[in-house]
């Protein structure tokens, strides 16, 4: 029980955290269930096993290189049983000897001097290090120091600078790239000895311009028959053998290396050749994480549109001849598979026995693209070698070309990968892999107006002589040099493109269309379409076509739940990008820009996406009633700001922020889709001239603050949004509130317009939503005893709720704004077009927002009904 107590930490609100498994539970029963679960029990057993092994082991050095484990075992058996010996196979300078019991270890250590074959041995206890659970390790590509990331992003000048800084923090350093080049050169040198004329091509994250710290090293071993003869410009030059050996020599302390904790499926420490073969084959998933950047993310099927047509000769063959040739083809295919499997085993044997520093080698012939997985100890890299993945090589070159064509591609992809990872949208299984997410970003950039990137079909047409390539029957032709292509005329800033991406994806028909990068537009999956046109293409909840292998839906593994969650998260992110918190750097030290987007998803953020319905009443009256409910009934402190509008037809370029705080009107676009018209360059959520205004009320926002963002003349500034303004607006036309841009002329001749979306920042110092029913019942009983009836009008109901709030606050809390920080603060946003209210947390250090949001979902609709009746 003591061990369990040391693993469990109590958290606020009755929650618990298991530090061993890196798991947080909501209550004590959930904690008890976790502690009895298989994951926790396995890790407890693994920790005990590692500790026992360490207590039985000794570190041995000083023996000659030609001494093997058998000789060491024979010597140490004189002191007691030997359970295991782990040799340093690379340099042969140390070994870990695990004795059968502690008494045998003590007998070894009690011997003052040890010698073997005339050489003195240095024997000392194995260093004991704190057990590190595999669950507590940082995900690949995530900076271990989150504080450094937060600080760097907070100090950036704007959102675009934050995105560029994120790339700098996550991309490989020059030293890491050189190390990978050395490993590739080492592989090239070794494989050339066995396969003269072969070429080792790196692909995936290493060369597609979207590398991150710790990404896998994916290699394609080309045995020949390449369509293009010139060498890969990204392939490293092979240095001399001596320089390779010295460059890859490990500088790690062997004692520390041997004591480094491993995952539950790893061996004790750096294993010998025999141990790597015997220990690792049971656990194919543990060897090296699959690289999503390669085209191996999901299963592929045969192409519908792009399958080569059946020739007339084949159609005229007789059935008997067809059957005979089918049998011959099956036999030939079987022979080819057996031959490929034999070559794969040969490659694995070469890696095991001939490449210094390589261990945990495993052949995986059953994969869609058969590979040999390996680990390289001196560099710490995981990787795989494939023999038939030339298409992925061109996919990587295509991604690299896209990043070279426009400097905004890399920051946008890095930011969205990080956002998806922190929101649990990318990864293995049913989640989006990085390759699919990158293609989704490229598709989005193809659909801008004007486009940021050309379509694949346009790139194919611009391929020059010598760049026409066909791989596995697919056209992979595109220019190699981005400087030959005309730059995009789209000059939108990164912050605007990021906001547009969220708006675009949240409105896409992911299941009813096929997003085609070759065409740069969605191909509608209409009902009644002949099945033979789609034969081989695996349609699903999300359909994203590979740029070259048109039979491959790179998002075929994504489930309906994940696709729906992707669009939900994009919708919430799009709403956030319309706020000043995204657009402006905080002067009060609060998170701004990218930082809230990159925070892990929480119950608060998920709840903020749930909408609260508003009654179908004139919007100015609804706004006024909402203010009364928040301020009078609940005692919220609402900090006011300025209401502003922009001139009609204002373009994105008029604002340094690209107008991302506007809400778009998409009626015209939706109509065009209903009529069956193509919208090849458009995407729902894009900026257009037909936009409606959004009014935002921000904390302590002054006209001077707005002048920094607004390019219009000062006389466009409108008065504060107060109850008097709302009263006048309602009196002006109580039954038909006007949308911005549709105003009428008042007595002064100036246009009177009403916003279509209003936001408030609210702060609470007391938990006025808890115990409210009990307090109301008590006050109603007092009113009844005094001979007064219950509330019959909206004003009486509001007065009663204000008394309930005061009762919950206590007798000594009559100040509108008490001193000190509020208990929590939130943003309430009302939308006229959607007739909904969105509530999102701003500051919630105690985790109280979920309870408040649950209360508001039932309280707000009933309160507005009472006030507006």
UniProtKB/Swiss-Prot annotation:
Instruction: Check the record and name the SMART domains matching this protein.
Output: RRM, ZnF_U1
Q: How is its activity regulated?
A: Adenylyltransferase activity is specifically phosphatidylinositol 4,5-bisphosphate (PtdIns(4,5)P2).
A Pfam family: MTPAP-like_central
From the UniProt record, list the reaction(s) this protein catalyses.
Answer: RNA(n) + UTP = RNA(n)-3'-uridine ribonucleotide + diphosphate; RNA(n) + ATP = RNA(n)-3'-adenine ribonucleotide + diphosphate
Which intervals of the chain are annotated as region Disordered? 114-144, 226-247, 259-335, 640-689, 735-757, 775-796, 803-822
What the entry lists under PANTHER family is as follows:
POLY A POLYMERASE CID PAP -RELATED, SPECKLE TARGETED PIP5K1A-REGULATED POLY(A) POLYMERASE
- Say which family it is in: Belongs to the DNA polymerase type-B-like family.
Q: Cite the record's note on assembly.
A: Associates with the cleavage and polyadenylation specificity factor (CPSF) complex. Interacts with CPSF1 and CPSF3; the interaction is direct. Interacts with PIP5K1A.
What are the disulfide bonds? none
Tell me which residues bind Mg(2+): 216, 218
Where it sits in the cell: the answer is: Nucleus, Nucleolus; Nucleus speckle
What GO biological process terms does the UniProt entry carry, in alphabetical order? co-transcriptional mRNA 3'-end processing, cleavage and polyadenylation pathway; regulation of RNA metabolic process; snRNA processing; U6 snRNA 3'-end processing
Question: Recorded E.C. number(s)?
Answer: 2.7.7.19, 2.7.7.52
What name does the UniProt record give this protein? Speckle targeted PIP5K1A-regulated poly(A) polymerase
Q: What class of enzyme is it?
A: transferase
Q: What is the lineage of its organism?
A: Eukaryota, Metazoa, Chordata, Craniata, Vertebrata
The known PTMs are summarized as: Phosphorylated by CK1 in the proline-rich (Pro-rich) region.
Q: Which residues bind ATP?
A: 205, 395
Question: What is the species of this protein?
Answer: Mus musculus
- Provide the binding site for UTP: 216, 218, 395, 417, 435, 552
**InterPro entries in the record:** Matrin/U1-like-C_Znf_C2H2 (IPR003604), MTPAP-like_central (IPR054708), NT_sf (IPR043519), Nucleotide-bd_a/b_plait_sf (IPR012677), PAP_assoc (IPR002058), RBD_domain_sf (IPR035979), RRM_dom (IPR000504), Star-PAP_RRM (IPR034388)
Q: Tell me the ranges covered by the PAP-associated domain, including all copies.
A: 494-552
Instruction: Name the residue ranges with Basic and acidic residues bias.
Output: 314-335, 671-689
Q: Which UniProt keywords apply?
A: ATP-binding, Magnesium, Manganese, Metal-binding, mRNA processing, Nucleotide-binding, Nucleotidyltransferase, Nucleus, Phosphoprotein, RNA-binding, Transferase, Zinc, Zinc-finger
Zinc finger (Matrin-type) locations? 16-46
Q: Where is the RRM domain?
A: 56-128
């Amino acid at each position: 029980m003591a061990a369990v107590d040391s693993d469990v930490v109590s958290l606020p609100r009755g929650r618990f955290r298991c530090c061993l498994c890196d798991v947080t539970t909501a209550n004590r029963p959930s904690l008890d269930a976790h502690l009895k679960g298989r994951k926790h029990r396995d890790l407890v057993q693994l920790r005990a096993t590692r500790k026992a092994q360490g207590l039985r082991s000794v570190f041995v050095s000083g023996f000659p290189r030609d001494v093997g484990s058998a000789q060491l075992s024979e010597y140490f058996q004189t002191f007691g049983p030997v359970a295991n010996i782990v040799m340093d196979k690379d340099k042969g300078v140390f070994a870990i000897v695990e004795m059968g019991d502690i008494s045998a270890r003590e007998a070894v250590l009690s011997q003052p001097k040890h010698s073997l074959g005339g050489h003195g041995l240095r024997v000392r206890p194995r260093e004991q290090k704190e057990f590190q659970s595999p669950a507590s390790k940082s995900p690949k590509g995530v900076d271990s120091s989150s504080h450094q990331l937060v600080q760097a992003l907070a100090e950036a000048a704007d959102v675009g600078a934050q995105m560029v800084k994120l790339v700098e923090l996550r991309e490989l350093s020059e030293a890491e790239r050189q190390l990978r080049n050395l490993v590739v050169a080492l592989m090239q040198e070794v494989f050339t000895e066995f396969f003269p004329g072969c070429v080792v091509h790196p692909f995936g994250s290493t060369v597609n311009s979207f590398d991150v710290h710790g990404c896998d090293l994916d290699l394609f071993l080309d045995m020949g028959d390449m369509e293009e003869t010139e060498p890969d410009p990204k392939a490293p030059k092979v240095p001399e053998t001596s320089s390779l050996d010295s460059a890859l020599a490990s500088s790690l302390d062997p004692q520390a290396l041997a004591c480094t904790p491993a995952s539950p499926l790893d061996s004790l420490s750096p294993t010998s050749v025999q141990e790597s073969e015997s220990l690792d084959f049971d656990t194919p998933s543990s060897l090296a994480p699959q690289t999503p950047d390669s085209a191996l993310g999901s299963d592929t099927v045969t192409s519908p549109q792009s399958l080569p047509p059946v020739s007339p000769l084949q159609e005229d063959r007789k059935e008997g001849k067809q059957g005979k040739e089918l049998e011959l083809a099956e036999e030939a295919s079987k022979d080819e598979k057996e031959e490929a499997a034999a070559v794969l085993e040969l490659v694995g044997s070469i890696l095991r026995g001939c490449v210094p520093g390589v261990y945990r080698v495993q052949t995986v012939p059953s994969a869609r693209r058969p590979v040999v997985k390996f680990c390289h100890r001196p560099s710490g890299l995981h990787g795989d070698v494939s023999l038939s993945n030339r298409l992925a090589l061109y996919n990587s070159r295509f991604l690299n070309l896209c990043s070279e064509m426009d400097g905004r591609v890399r920051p946008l992809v890095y930011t969205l990968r990080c956002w998806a990872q922190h929101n649990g949208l990318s990864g293995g299984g049913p989640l989006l892999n990085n390759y699919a997410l990158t293609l989704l970003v490229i598709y989005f950039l193809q659909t801008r107006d004007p486009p940021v990137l050309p379509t694949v079909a346009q790139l194919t047409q611009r391929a020059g002589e010598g760049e026409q390539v066909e791989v596995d029957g697919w056209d992979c032709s595109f220019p190699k040099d981005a400087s030959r292509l005309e730059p995009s005329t789209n000059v939108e800033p990164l912050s605007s493109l990021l906001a547009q991406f969220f708006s675009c994806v949240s409105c896409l028909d992911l299941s009813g269309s096929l997003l085609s990068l070759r065409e740069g537009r969605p191909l509608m999956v209409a009902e009644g379409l002949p099945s033979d046109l789609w034969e081989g293409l695996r349609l699903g909840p999300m359909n994203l076509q590979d740029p070259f292998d048109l039979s491959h839906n790179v998002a075929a593994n994504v489930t309906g739940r994940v696709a729906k969650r992707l669009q939900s998260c994009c919708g919430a992110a799009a709403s956030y990008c319309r706020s000043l918190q995204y657009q402006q750097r905080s002067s009060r030290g609060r998170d701004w820009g990218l930082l809230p987007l990159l925070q892990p998803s929480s119950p608060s953020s998920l709840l903020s996406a749930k909408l609260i319905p508003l009654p179908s009443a004139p919007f100015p009256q609804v706004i006024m009633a909402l203010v009364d409910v928040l301020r009078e009934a609940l005692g919220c402190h609402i900090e006011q700001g300025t209401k502003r509008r922009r001139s009609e037809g204002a373009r994105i370029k008029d604002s340094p922020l690209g107008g991302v705080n506007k809400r778009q009107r998409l009626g015209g676009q939706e109509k065009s889709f209903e009529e069956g018209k193509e919208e090849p360059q458009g995407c729902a959520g894009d900026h257009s001239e037909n936009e409606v205004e959004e009014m935002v009320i921000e904390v302590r926002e002054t006209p001077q603050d707005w002048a920094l963002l607004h390019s219009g003349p000062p006389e466009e500034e409108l008065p504060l949004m107060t109850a008097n303004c709302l009263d006048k607006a309602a009196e002006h036309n109580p039954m038909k509130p006007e949308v911005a841009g549709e105003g009428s002329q008042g007595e002064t001749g100036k246009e009177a317009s009403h916003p279509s979306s209003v936001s408030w920042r609210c702060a609470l110092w007391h938990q006025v939503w808890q115990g409210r029913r009990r307090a109301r019942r008590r006050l109603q009983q007092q009113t009844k005893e005094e001979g007064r009836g219950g509330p019959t009008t909206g004003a009486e109901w509001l007065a009663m709720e204000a008394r309930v709030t005061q009762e919950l606050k206590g007798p000594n809390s009559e100040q509108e704004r008490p001193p000190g920080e509020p208990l929590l603060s939130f943003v309430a946003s009302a939308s006229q077009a959607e007739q909904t209210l969105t509530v999102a947390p701003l500051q919630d250090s105690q985790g109280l927002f979920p309870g408040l949001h649950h209360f508001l979902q039932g309280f707000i609709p009933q309160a507005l009904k009472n006030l507006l009746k």
